[in-house]
């Protein structure tokens, strides 16, 4: 299948035995590195406009998390071979394995969206000095704000067995997000590209496991890592940050944006009343040149 606007050649790396991650490595090998991390239920396709707008000068690294996009989608049953546990810590470890493989030990720009924030800032806990610039879009690096209720659409998948069945049977989360996660309707071919990797029950495993891994309390497996990321977030206030936010997002809404503003008061912010969760779909014509200008104003 071809994907509109995605004229790139993915590469593959076994991040653990028998489990391969698909990723992009676009742009000059000696260019300033921009690591772009997607969330759920998207994949690296989310970043295509930014890759196209930066890769003449910048080295763009764009992984598809395991179970997502063009990466392998292993089972997590106890007897599965190979087996993957679909936890936040495993996502962080996978990212570290990829960047080690690519020899990226110098300064980077960390660009994040959705779960990409928790993965990226989780990785940054042990690579703080490498992260020199931040590009933050509709994401989190701290627990659910107390004033923010969990959207029922997310709670359904996280808490209810019926929700898991519905998501895995009908691709409800990926398909729904392609309609409801934008303010400007996606062209049909773009919408198909977003949902194509999740074309059967087996291939939808990660879209539900991400939801079930959302840390809401200390009893949850990912809580400790997220809490440490939250504690470390203000320590990034000494370096350039760019925040782009779609204010119509039902999940990562104004409460999450406010959390980032408090932690990173130096950040340049572009918040859009008429943009949604996939802010790079709704506003890529504005954001791609704005992000490039931000990088050029703040060279590594």
Swiss-Prot record:
Predominant subcellular localization, coarse grouping: cytoplasm
Keywords: Cytoplasm, Lyase
Source superkingdom: Bacteria
Catalyzed reaction equations: a cis-3-alkyl-4-alkyloxetan-2-one = a cis-alkene + CO2
GO cellular component: cytoplasm; membrane
Family: Belongs to the AB hydrolase superfamily.
Assembly with partners or alone: Homotetramer. Forms a complex with OleC and OleD.
Protein name: Cis-3-alkyl-4-alkyloxetan-2-one decarboxylase
Organism listed in the record: Xanthomonas campestris pv. campestris (strain ATCC 33913 / DSM 3586 / NCPPB 528 / LMG 568 / P 25)
């Amino acid at each position: 299948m071809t994907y509109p606007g995605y004229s790139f050649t993915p590469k593959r790396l076994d991040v653990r035995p028998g489990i391969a991650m698909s990723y992009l490595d676009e742009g000059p090998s000696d260019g300033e590195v921009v690591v772009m991390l997607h969330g759920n239920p998207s994949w690296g396709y989310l970043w295509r406009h930014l890759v196209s707008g930066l890769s003449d000068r910048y080295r763009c690294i764009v992984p598809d998390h395991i179970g997502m996009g063009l990466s392998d989608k292993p089972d997590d049953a106890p007897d599965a071979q190979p087996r993957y546990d679909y936890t936040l810590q495993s996502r962080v470890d996978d990212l570290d394995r990829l960047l080690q493989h690519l020899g990226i030990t110098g300064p980077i720009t960390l660009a994040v969206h959705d779960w990409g924030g928790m993965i990226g800032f989780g990785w940054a806990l042990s690579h703080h000095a490498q992260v020199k610039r931040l590009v933050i879009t509709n994401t989190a690096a701290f627990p659910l704000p107390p004033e923010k209720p969990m959207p029922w659409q997310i709670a359904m998948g996280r808490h209810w067995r019926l929700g898991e069945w519905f998501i895995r049977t009908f691709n409800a989360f990926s398909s729904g997000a392609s309609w409801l996660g934008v303010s400007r309707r996606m062209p049909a071919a773009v919408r198909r590209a977003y949902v194509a990797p999740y074309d059967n029950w087996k291939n939808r495993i990660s879209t539900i496991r991400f939801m079930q891994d959302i840390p809401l309390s200390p009893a949850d497996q990912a809580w400790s890592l997220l809490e440490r990321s939250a504690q470390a977030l203000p320590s990034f206030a000494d370096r350039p940050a760019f925040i782009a936010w779609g204010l119509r997002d039902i999940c990562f809404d104004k409460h999450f944006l406010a959390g980032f503003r408090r932690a990173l008061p130096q950040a340049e912010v572009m918040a859009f009343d008429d943009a949604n969760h996939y802010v790079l779909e709704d506003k890529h014509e504005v954001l791609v040149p704005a992000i490039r200008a931000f990088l050029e104003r703040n060279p590594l």
